[in-house]
Design a protein with these regions (language model features):
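Soluble ligand-binding/transfer domains with enclosed cavities or grooves
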Residues: 5-145
């Protein structure tokens, strides 16, 4: 894998365009009132458009509920942008900067009254997106693991 940030971002783009599967886990932690405790697996369809990869996800949760989601990954010279699809459009949540050999969240995301924190970990054939949500009624960890 490349050593500098741009090389690493290109490597991740090449890897992510081959993602086909997802495993998902949601956990409610102490103080949460949401009851988000799910595990699921599913498939991902990836659509390429210039410096963007659109993920169309179909997940079957452990309670047999189907869950569909869409995400957008934007690959820039010095960061990877992460967007979620909400209210009919893509909304930027995080920018992950390449720093000291790993991707670091530039800043947390506020969706009042909740604050979102993100982590992105890369292994040989897996990408893990970890999102922590904290607020008055929420204390959740959402883990998306993408597999090629």
């Amino acid at each position: 894998m490349g050593g500098n940030g741009m090389d690493r971002i290109i490597d991740i783009y090449e890897m992510m365009k081959n993602v086909r599967r997802i495993s998902f886990q949601a956990k409610s932690l102490e103080g949460s009132s949401t009851g988000w405790n799910y595990v699921g697996k599913g498939n991902v369809v990836v659509r390429e458009e210039e410096d963007r990869l659109y993920f169309i996800e179909e997940i079957i949760l452990d309670n047999d509920i189907r869950y569909s989601d869409r995400k957008l990954w934007e690959f820039k010279e010095n960061y990877i942008g992460f967007y979620r699809f909400r209210n009919g459009d893509y909304e930027k949540i995080f920018e992950f900067l390449f720093c000291d050999g790993e991707f670091m969240m530039k800043k947390e995301y506020l969706c009042s009254p909740d604050l979102y924190y993100g982590e992105m970990k890369i292994w040989d054939n897996r990408i893990c997106l970890l999102i922590k949500v904290k607020g008055e009624k929420k204390n959740e960890v959402l883990e998306y693991t993408y597999l090629t």
